[in-house]
Swiss-Prot record:
Name of the protein described by the UniProt record: tRNA nuclease HepT
Residue(s) carrying O-di-AMP-tyrosine: Y109
Family: Belongs to the HepT RNase toxin family.
Gene3D superfamilies referenced in this protein's UniProt entry, alphabetically: bsu32300-like
Entry's Gene Ontology cellular component terms: toxin-antitoxin complex
Reactions listed under catalytic activity: (tRNA)-3'-end (ribonucleoside 5'-phosphate)-(guanosyl 5'-phosphate)-(cytosyl 5'-phosphate)-(cytosyl 5'-phosphate)-(adenosine 5'-phosphate) + H2O = GpCpCpA + tRNA 3'-end (ribonucleotide 3'-phosphate) + H(+)
Subunit field text: Homodimer. Forms a complex with MntA, probably MntA(1):HepT(2) in vivo; can only be purified when both Arg-102 and Tyr-109 (or His-107 and Tyr-109) of this protein have been mutated. The fully di-AMPylated homodimer is not found in a complex with MntA.
GO molecular function per UniProt: endonuclease activity; nucleotide binding; RNA nuclease activity
Top-level taxonomic group: Bacteria
Gene name as annotated: hepT
Length: 147
């Protein structure tokens, strides 16, 4: 079987959960309030970056064990997990673009558009709990296969 280490994945899933809990504080903020608070913009940008990075780390760990030697872009890694039915193909397609926002936040490729980041808050709060559930289901499947 694979040498996937559940503890690596579980640790990152817990981090995603903690980050999502903090991001929920911004769930009902108005766009005007968000745009007028540089501090809130920085906090949400960082939380979105951390959520996405933890998912990327999970994806990389799983794929490195399933397809040793093959490398994927962060976007492709989400799609690949959909092909393996670890994520539903629908979720994989929906969530994969979040890796692009993460790259913009980390590397500041372009000016960061606070309107885009604002919209990403509700997206992350909807999609990443699904990601966590589907990865947890995959871990349960692995555990059952190893019993």
């Amino acid at each position: 079987m694979t040498n996937i280490e559940p503890v690596i994945i579980e640790t990152r899933l817990e981090l995603i959960g903690r980050y999502l809990d903090h991001l929920k504080k911004f769930e009902n903020i108005s766009l005007d309030d968000y745009l007028s608070s540089f501090e809130q913009q920085l906090i949400t940008e960082r939380l979105l970056q951390l959520i996405t990075q933890a998912a990327i780390d999970i994806n990389d760990h799983i794929l490195s064990k399933l397809k040793s030697g093959k490398s994927y872009t962060n976007f492709e890694a989400f799609i690949e997990l959909g092909k393996y039915q670890i994520l539903t193909p629908e979720l994989a397609k929906q969530i994969a673009p979040s890796s692009g926002l993460r790259n913009r936040l980390v590397h500041e490729y372009d000016d960061i558009d606070p309107n885009q980041v604002f919209m990403a808050i509700s997206f992350a709060l909807q999609q990443y709990p699904l990601y966590v559930r589907q990865i947890n289901s995959y871990l349960i499947t692995l555990e059952e296969e190893n019993d």
